[in-house]
């Protein structure tokens, strides 16, 4: 894991097209802004995990439906 230190208003780049800017710090929370192309999905980790779980469930349901239609 790469660990970086940034101050409010400073930005880091991920590749050539994604930038992450520290917008503010309040207590133990950090507000960040992410600029990325539309084709790059940006989610909080808990949302990403939920999406992955739902996709896996759709695959399982599709397999069940296919096996019952034989």
Swiss-Prot record:
Record has RNA-binding as a keyword: yes
Keyword Lipid biosynthesis: no
Family (UniProt): Belongs to the CsrA/RsmA family.
InterPro entries the UniProt entry points to: CsrA, CsrA_sf
Gene3D superfamilies for the chain: Translational regulator CsrA
Role played: A key translational regulator that binds mRNA to regulate translation initiation and/or mRNA stability. Mediates global changes in gene expression, shifting from rapid growth to stress survival by linking envelope stress, the stringent response and the catabolite repression systems. Usually binds in the 5'-UTR; binding at or near the Shine-Dalgarno sequence prevents ribosome-binding, repressing translation, binding elsewhere in the 5'-UTR can activate translation and/or stabilize the mRNA. Its function is antagonized by small RNA(s).
Name of one Pfam family that matches: CsrA
HAMAP family attached to this UniProt entry: CsrA
Keywords: Activator, Cytoplasm, Repressor, RNA-binding, Translation regulation
Recorded name of the encoding gene: csrA
GO molecular function, one term: mRNA 5'-UTR binding
Localization per Swiss-Prot or TrEMBL: Cytoplasm
Listed GO biological process terms: mRNA catabolic process; negative regulation of translational initiation; positive regulation of translational initiation; regulation of carbohydrate metabolic process
Subunit structure as annotated in this protein's UniProt entry: Homodimer; the beta-strands of each monomer intercalate to form a hydrophobic core, while the alpha-helices form wings that extend away from the core.
A GO-annotated cellular component: cytosol
Protein name, per record: Translational regulator CsrA
Organism in which the protein naturally occurs: Acinetobacter baylyi (strain ATCC 33305 / BD413 / ADP1)
